[in-house]
Amino acid sequence: MNYIGTWVFHSIATMNDKDEIVFLSAEEYMKAPMPYVDETDEEAVADELRERKRMVSTHLKVCTDGKLYMLSPLPEGVPQEEVDKAVAAGIITLVDGMMTDRPLMWEERDGDLWYDTGIEGELFGEKTDSWVKAIDDEGFFIFATTRFVKA
């Protein structure tokens, strides 16, 4: 499989009422209950909806140079002049017109895409590997709790 290119949001994992993991499409996620948000607080609900919209608009970009970028849309209503100043000051980085943090590294191992999460630690006294296999058996790119498909 050719992994190079842009991957777009497909679905996000959440728990249903039976404590089972289910994946919600963008539309389902935007309409899903907000159990951890006071839904009587309009500002909190608006913040959560903005965050959800940002999440479903996120892309992953797998580049030929071994870099993997998580791309987020610019906040709505920010003037281009302000964006240009933030870029010039090094506050944000843009790739394909979207914001990104430092890239992660990726490599192919036995035909599979692996990426370095950058998360290091120990499990039962043994050092854990920060590299994870990206593509699941269904062909989705798994990044944390989110599934992406090749655009």
Features from the language model and the residues they span:
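Contiguous, well-ordered beta-strand patches that form the walls/edges
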Residues: 12-18, 42-150
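N-terminal helix-cap/turn-to-beta initiation motif at the start of protein domains
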Residues: 1-8
